[in-house]
Amino acid sequence: MKRAVVVFSGGQDSTTCLVQALQQYDEVHCVTFDYGQRHRAEIDVARELALKLGARAHKVLDVTLLNELAVSSLTRDSIPVPDYEPEADGIPNTFVPGRNILFLTLAAIYAYQVKAEAVITGVCETDFSGYPDCRDEFVKALNHAVSLGMAKDIRFETPLMWIDKAETWALADYYGKLDLVRNETLTCYNGIKGDGCGHCAACNLRANGLNHYLADKPTVMAAMKQKTGLN
């Protein structure tokens, strides 16, 4: 039996990953992390979606220690989430240092326990928000370290790594879940479901990708299929 664990926030990217994983694996588990995030409404959204989509199990792990260590606008109410700035340079204040290091490591431990062969994460390098822990180089390096440390080949899969947001919408549509991802996921840094606040970087990436996809579905769908190998 093929098993996978999805690092699941209830947002656009991880929900799209879950939708695909359910088609590719016999048994899919979801792991969601409570780190005291500003947008912690995502935890309830993740619970609802994991149940609705048919995950075998959904584990919510308390990692609030991260909130004490990692200073970010997503972990401190006193630091405002900035509006999207297209010309901004450097790492944004929404970056939570160590978050994906912790999440992927804990997800791998869970995968070890449930005998899953893969940990799936929705990180992406093509239009990411400037986070160093969304890079392919990082994921591969951590995957190597974790596999060595556990003496077990647990594969980190990144199905969205080389597709952009428009193509991620196309992937959701490919599996017949475009409306669900648009209306029932939570991507917004300010914790607003669906189309979100419309001002933060997460909402901007999501909206621009959707508009691009809806404006030229055939071209974007074809590009997504070519990059992912789907028919």
Curated annotation (Swiss-Prot):
Transmembrane residue ranges: none
Catalytic activity from the UniProt record: 7-carboxy-7-deazaguanine + NH4(+) + ATP = 7-cyano-7-deazaguanine + ADP + phosphate + H2O + H(+)
Keywords recorded for this protein, A-Z: ATP-binding, Ligase, Metal-binding, Nucleotide-binding, Queuosine biosynthesis, Zinc
Function field: Catalyzes the ATP-dependent conversion of 7-carboxy-7-deazaguanine (CDG) to 7-cyano-7-deazaguanine (preQ(0)).
Residues holding Zn(2+): C188, C197, C200, C203
Entry-linked Pfam families: QueC (PF06508)
Cofactor binding note from Swiss-Prot or TrEMBL: Binds 1 zinc ion per subunit.
Enzyme class: ligase
HAMAP family on file: QueC (MF_01633)
Residues annotated for ATP binding in this entry: F8, S9, G10, G11, Q12, D13, S14, T15, T16, C17, L18
Cofactor(s) in the UniProt record: Zn(2+)
Similarity section: Belongs to the QueC family.
One GO BP annotation of this record: queuosine biosynthetic process
Gene3D superfamilies: HUPs (3.40.50.620)
InterPro entries according to UniProt: QueC (IPR018317), Rossmann-like_a/b/a_fold (IPR014729)
EC number: 6.3.4.20
MF terms (GO), sorted A to Z: ATP binding; ligase activity, forming carbon-nitrogen bonds; zinc ion binding
NCBIfam families on file: 7-cyano-7-deazaguanine synthase QueC, PRK11106.1
Protein name stated in the entry: 7-cyano-7-deazaguanine synthase
SUPFAM superfamilies, sorted: Adenine nucleotide alpha hydrolases-like
Pathway(s) of this molecule: Purine metabolism; 7-cyano-7-deazaguanine biosynthesis
